[in-house]
A protein has these predicted regions:
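An alpha-helical, amphipathic repeat domain used for nucleic-acid recognition
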Residues: 1-179
């Protein structure tokens, strides 16, 4: 599928016979795509340009019209995406940044969305939830190998190294005081 998209980018200056019909079809496709799930402007543009019956000029007009109707707003999309990702599964800033970079959003929108999402849900609360869940599922790490796996799991979730180290030390202290 990605090869098809690359091929279509090469002929983006297609000549369209009936511009009005192509604009209408493009608008209908855009509304259907947005009805299925929210998308960024970049994602929608890419999906619309896949079709042979449209070109860049028509897609630009359709996207401008959708922004005018408030169907497309990258800033709001980024904020909603960041907060929903954090609600679904606790993850660190690095993993969230990586997930949002796939959505073809501007760096400014991504940074602002991540900042506001982590103001609402601090990273320390998220890592505590992740640790609690991991302890519930796997139990307390007994061996050095288990501790390393636990640590690596939290790193893969995108949490900062120093934050993980501090929280793991806290978990070890709590375990020692309980015994």
């Amino acid at each position: 599928m990605w090869r098809k998209r690359l091929e279509l980018r090469a002929d983006k200056d297609r000549i369209i016979a009936d511009v009005e019909k192509a604009r209408e079809r493009t608008m209908n496709r855009a509304v259907k795509l947005l009805a299925a799930k929210p998308r960024s402007v970049g994602e929608l543009r890419e999906r619309l340009l896949e079709k042979n019956w449209t070109n860049e000029a028509i897609v630009d007009r359709v996207i401008a019209k959708l922004e005018e109707y408030k169907y497309l707003d990258d800033q709001q999309f980024a904020a909603d995406l960041a907060s929903s990702k954090l609600r679904q599964r606790p993850q660190g800033k690095r993993k969230l940044l990586q997930a949002m970079s796939r959505k073809k959003l501007s760096k400014e929108n991504v940074d602002a969305a991540i900042k506001s999402a982590f103001e609402k849900l601090p990273e320390t609360d998220l890592i505590d939830r992740a640790i609690e869940k991991r302890l519930r599922l796997k139990g307390k790490p007994e061996t050095l190998e288990d501790k390393k796996k636990f640590f690596d799991h939290l790193l893969r979730q995108g949490f900062d190294y120093s934050l993980i180290r501090d929280r793991m030390n806290d978990v070890a202290k709590v375990d020692l005081s309980n015994e």
